[in-house]
């Protein structure tokens, strides 16, 4: 049984992670944290999520519970995730990171910590999205050289970063399959007189509206035809279940940086 701590357990995603951990037969929620100023600190995590009494209470600092968990699952914000990453390094704990919006310097720090403890990091934890990443690699190898590639993503009005980590992950999969770095070919905004698109660029468009959980489409467009690969999520439990699956898988692994491709064994396809 893998003992899991949920960072930001009172948030929308945090509550789903608590539920997903509770229903997974190989996992148990044994700790959860919230911001120190939260009025929910001290509340029973199970009751908070409508799952009944767990006798596990929200803390304002996971270090207070460090002997009570094996793996942290963190879908919060970069500054909080990096603090929990350092905590895991100091105490030899594993961490599953679902937070997005890291700078290049912060990503480098995560890579450095992964030399000391097991880390899974992915822009999206749904099985379907990670299968899409593999499909995009294959499509890019066949069509990327002669098609225009555009990525469109849509999320709810409360999402604070754009484009989404999943959209960037799609772009990285396509660019990598074509021998490029995404940072060299990505175009994140178009406005006014932009001129014709270049051959290699990968364009991104972002929608923020209503309660959209997450929709992503990658388009390979040629003259006379186009191929679109789309994923639509309708329930955040999809992501939560995948993250808990990753936590259970990670617990038995040595220090290193892993992705959902590793968790799901997609490199074997």
UniProtKB/Swiss-Prot annotation:
EC number: 1.17.1.8
Active site: 155 (proton donor/acceptor), 159 (proton donor)
Binding-site positions, NADP(+): 35
PANTHER family: 4-HYDROXY-TETRAHYDRODIPICOLINATE REDUCTASE 1, CHLOROPLASTIC-RELATED, DIHYDRODIPICOLINATE REDUCTASE
Main localization, broad class: cytoplasm
Protein name: 4-hydroxy-tetrahydrodipicolinate reductase
Binding site for (S)-2,3,4,5-tetrahydrodipicolinate: 156, 165-166
One example of a Gene Ontology biological process annotation: diaminopimelate biosynthetic process
Cell membrane among keywords: no
Function: Catalyzes the conversion of 4-hydroxy-tetrahydrodipicolinate (HTPA) to tetrahydrodipicolinate.
Reaction catalysis annotation: (S)-2,3,4,5-tetrahydrodipicolinate + NAD(+) + H2O = (2S,4S)-4-hydroxy-2,3,4,5-tetrahydrodipicolinate + NADH + H(+); (S)-2,3,4,5-tetrahydrodipicolinate + NADP(+) + H2O = (2S,4S)-4-hydroxy-2,3,4,5-tetrahydrodipicolinate + NADPH + H(+)
Classification via Gene3D superfamilies: Dihydrodipicolinate Reductase, domain 2 (3.30.360.10), NAD(P)-binding Rossmann-like Domain (3.40.50.720)
């Amino acid at each position: 049984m893998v003992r899991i701590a949920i960072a930001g357990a009172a948030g929308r995603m945090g509550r789903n992670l608590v539920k997903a951990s509770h229903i997974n037969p190989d996992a148990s929620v044994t700790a959860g944290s919230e911001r120190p100023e939260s009025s929910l600190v001290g509340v029973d995590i199970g009751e908070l999520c409508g799952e009944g009494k767990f006798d596990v209470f929200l803390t304002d600092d996971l270090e207070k519970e460090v002997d009570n968990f094996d793996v942290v699952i963190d879908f919060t914000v970069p500054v909080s995730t990096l603090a929990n990453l350092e905590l895991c390094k100091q105490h030899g704990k594993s961490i599953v990171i679902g937070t997005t919006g890291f700078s290049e310097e912060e990503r480098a720090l995560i890579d450095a910590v992964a030399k000391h403890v097991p880390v899974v990091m992915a822009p999206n934890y749904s099985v379907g999205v990670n299968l899409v990443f593999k499909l995009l690699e294959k499509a890019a190898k066949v069509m990327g050289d002669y098609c225009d590639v555009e990525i469109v993503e849509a999320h709810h009005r409360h999402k604070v970063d754009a484009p989404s980590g999943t959209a960037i992950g799609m772009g990285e999969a396509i660019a990598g399959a074509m021998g490029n770095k995404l940072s060299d070919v990505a175009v994140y905004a178009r406005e006014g007189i932009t001129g014709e698109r270049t051959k290699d660029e990968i364009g991104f468009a972002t929608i923020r509206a209503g309660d959209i959980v997450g929709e992503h489409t990658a388009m390979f467009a040629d003259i006379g035809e186009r191929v679109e690969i789309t994923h639509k999520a309708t329930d955040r439990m999809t992501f939560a279940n995948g993250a808990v699956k990753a936590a259970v898988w990670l617990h038995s692994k040595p220090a290193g940086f892993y992705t959902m491709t590793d968790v799901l064994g997609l490199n074997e396809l």
